[in-house]
Amino acid sequence: VSMLAPQGDALVFTLSGLSKAAGLPQMKLGWIHVAGPAPLRDEALERLDWIADAYLPVGAPVQHAAARWLARAHDVRTAICSRVEASRAALDCRLNAGGATRVLPSEGGWSAIVQVPRVHSEEEWALQLLSRHGVLVQPGYFYDFSTEALLVVSLLAAPEDVASGADAVLDLLKTFSFDRRWSIL
């Protein structure tokens, strides 16, 4: 069943744009597919049209280039998927080796969640990685995770950079003195 197909008597809004479709987050062009019962759909489209005209103009350069970008979108998405898979493998190889860190399972996306020992706050982990190693991660609380200590790592970086960042986590772990009771397990 297509995600664009109407589901019963409800309106279904499917959002997309150049950011995800063509790997171009800096080029602001998005669209909404509206499905559902004709009267509700038509009213929603009228309102969306007004909002788009009033608040969401698309720049002429983006309009001019959009067709070419979309024609190349499949190749870009394929390259992004390959890079994300390779970066994930590099991260898994280093941080899932049975030590005090682990990469949590995921079902997709271009970020990984790394669980580290709760010897310091997520913020302290992030700050230490940045100041000591130049490695940028985000603390899990940015994403409203309810448990500590989680770090969110971008998988869009080159696999060798992700591997280097993982090595920095392990190096930093060596400098933290902690009792094994504080391990993540």
Q: Which residues does each predicted region cover?
A:
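Conserved PLP phosphate-binding loop immediately N-terminal to the Schiff-base lysine helix
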Residues: V1-M3
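Conserved core segment of the aminotransferase class I/II
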Residues: A5-E85, L173-K174, F178
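A short linear hydrophobic-aromatic micro-motif
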Residues: T14, G99-V103, L136-Y141
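Short, solvent-exposed loop/turn segments at secondary-structure junctions
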Residues: S19-A21, P39, G108-S111, V119, ...
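Short hydrophobic/aromatic beta-strand micro-patches
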Residues: H33, I113-Q115, S154-L156
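Conserved glycine-rich beta-strand-loop-beta hairpin in the small C-terminal domain of fold type I
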Residues: A67, S82-D92, R102-V116, T147
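Surface-exposed helix-capping loop/turn segments at secondary-structure junctions
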Residues: L95-L104, S177-R181
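PLP-dependent enzyme catalytic core of the Aspartate aminotransferase-like
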Residues: Q128-V137, Y143-L185
